[in-house]
Amino acid sequence: MNNVKDLQTIEETLKYLQFDNWEQSAPGLARSRELLGLLGNPEQKLKFVHIAGTNGKGSTAAMLASVLQHAGYRTGLYTSPHLLRFHERMRVNGEEIDDNSLISLTNTVRNAAERMSEMPTGFEIMTAIAFLYFVQEQCDIVSLEVGLGGRMDSTNVIPAPEVCVVANIGLEHTAILGDTVEKIAAEKCGIIKHGSHAVLFGQSESVENVAREKCAQEDVALTITAQEKLERISSSLDGQAFKYRGRGPYHLRLLGEYQLLNTLTVIDVCSALRSRGWDKLTDEAIDEGLSHAQWPGRLELLRRGPDFIVDGAHNPQCVDALMDSLAALYGDKKLIFLTGVLRDKDWQQMLRRALPLAKAFVVITPPSARALDENELAAWLNAQGVQAVPAKDTDDGVRRALELAGEDDAICSWGSLYFTGEVRRVLTEQ
């Protein structure tokens, strides 16, 4: 056994948690099971709502956590990646994990990991820390977001959750999850377990059929969200009001059509939880939770005059949803876009979708070996007939976007969650 010296400071702890070796590790749950066994199986002392999906799973997890908290349940929330700081990944009743808990629980998990024959991945270690934290904090229930996929994700070691949720599904991580939406859906639906209730975001028939098949195998009741039962009342930069399945009105603080549709999933999850005895989830609690829900970096309005919106859109499906939401908010008004893209993403398709709404672009090179150079991106955009200004970094990009904008203009930054976090940092420091 290795006698490793305990981590003493938050800086040391965060440095330790930065490693990510999942690409070098064989997929599977064996390492997580062994690690959690060494820690006394904290996951078996908790109740969960488990949430998978390509787009919207983080927003769904955050909105659900807000509703559960406002209903009076002590609620854990586990999400990834973080936007500004690591602590965001683990919250109880909206409060991020404190430094002392993070240091001491990381030491506990690290000491257990050192006793294993195969080192766990960074995400497996983080997930174990989160489970210990939620037990320590005596959570009634945890809103648990899957890291990647579902079936083989380290969060999938939990016993049957109260509700399994599958949010919107698209093509992503195809090398790991499969090259068709149906194969990816099968991986995501791998979180559905006997003894649970499943809720699926209403989408293509092929995905719905995959979910139905898995629920039949596991003998699990399935609810599919029904967009036709959504009645929109109002939508503005101040939020949205709506009814669903004849109930409401509900008020949502978050902007965007896609967030409104994610809310239907949350409401259906609450109905499933109510049927399992979580009877404090009244319509009043749902409304209260939705009207207070925050999910930074997703169609988030950071300032007015000019409006400055940030969004983490990073794939064609997300960009489609973002452009639909911006068109709904701003009508025919053209926007200034601040973005940077990765060469291995379908960047031309994403930018083509943004072109009809663009007054101009300010472009940067993201800090990644896979980044597309800002000058190359600006040249491509200029060739499409739109003004594009290259910027040397995020600070310069924000400055140039604000210089281009008049008081009545709107700026929207998008491209990745990391970039969104950087733009948020620059704007809040100004």
Predicted segments — roles?
Residues 78-81, 200-202, 214-236, 253-257, ...:
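Beta-strand->loop->alpha-helix junctions that form or flank phosphate-binding loops
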Residues 201-223, 237-238, 307-310, 316, ...:
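C-terminal helical cap/extension that packs against the catalytic core
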Residues 1-55, 59-74, 83-84, 138, ...:
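N-terminal leader/targeting and accessory segments in enzymes
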Residues 45, 141-144, 152-165, 169-172, ...:
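Nucleotide phosphate-binding/pyrophosphate-handling subdomain across enzymes
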Residues 64-69, 134, 273, 381, ...:
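Hydrophobic alpha-helical packing residues
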Residues 416:
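Active-site-proximal loop/hinge segments that shape catalytic or ion-binding/gating pockets
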Residues 117-118, 138-145, 161-246, 263, ...:
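Acidic, Mg2+-coordinating active-site environments of NTP-dependent enzymes
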